[in-house]
Amino acid sequence: MADEMSEPRRVGFVGAGRMAEAIAQGLIRAGKVEAKQVLASAPTDKNLCHFRALGCQTTHSNHEVLQNCPLVIFATKPQVLPAVLAEVAPVVTTEHIIVSVAAGISLSSMEELLPPKTRVLRVSPNLPCVVQEGAMVMTRGHHAGNEDAKLLQNLLEACGQCIEVPESYVDIHTGLSGSGVAFVCTFSEALAEGAIKMGMPSDLAHRIAAQTLLGTAKMLQQEGKHPAQLRTDVLTPAGTTIHGLHALEQGGFRAAAMSAVEAATCRAKELSKK
């Protein structure tokens, strides 16, 4: 099965929302799988139309997806995933690789709902997967092997960065990167509004703020510098940047950002226990 799965002929999606569409789009654009070899299911046509627009096959039957695809990504809402797994369990075999992108549902919970020795993996994505710049982590269950993990990682790198981690890191990733998208957007908005206050037109301010975040992120990735080092590179004695940083420190910016990640992580852990 390992040779067959090295390049899966068919990839299935149970659930066809925005994240499922983003992952499918990334796989197709990167040439990881042909559009006609993607099969997605959902209860209604509301989201399936987006998959059809990509050239994918669609169905209202979850069983049909499992019966036709060796690798199936479950992208349902977390509250319905247990019921969906219980529904498809009769058609799941040890030949399947089952992947969940639903938040708050542990590997052990999924394994309990599926047949013995089912190969299960869990992925925590974030919204930039929509533009193939996601920051994802993945973790595997008891019966998923190295080849399964490598296969999934290779596929998902079409949607951004995908790193294998212990499951205990998944909730932290939710606080850092899943919720972090909103934190970064809030910072970008605040930067732009500062410029607007000083007289810059709104559209221009927001464009420049977004590009500043993008350029800074690329420098951090490509140069491999610690953020503190890059920040220091911008500083000049008695210059504009140190005055601005002083204002951020007076406002408790650093502590607020740390507390935001902590609060979001704690909430993710609470939801995982329910």
From Swiss-Prot:
Family matches, as InterPro entries:
6-PGluconate_DH-like_C_sf, NAD(P)-bd_dom_sf, P5C_Rdtase_cat_N, P5CR_dimer, Pyrroline-COOH_reductase
Q: Which residues carry this modification: N-acetylalanine?
A: 2
Q: Where in the sequence is the signal peptide annotated?
A: none
Q: List GO terms (cellular component aspect).
A: cytosol
- Where mainly located? cytoplasm
> Which molecular function term from Gene Ontology is one that the record holds?
pyrroline-5-carboxylate reductase activity
- Protein's name in the database: Pyrroline-5-carboxylate reductase 3
Species annotation: Rattus norvegicus
Query: Which gene name belongs to this protein?
Result: Pycr3
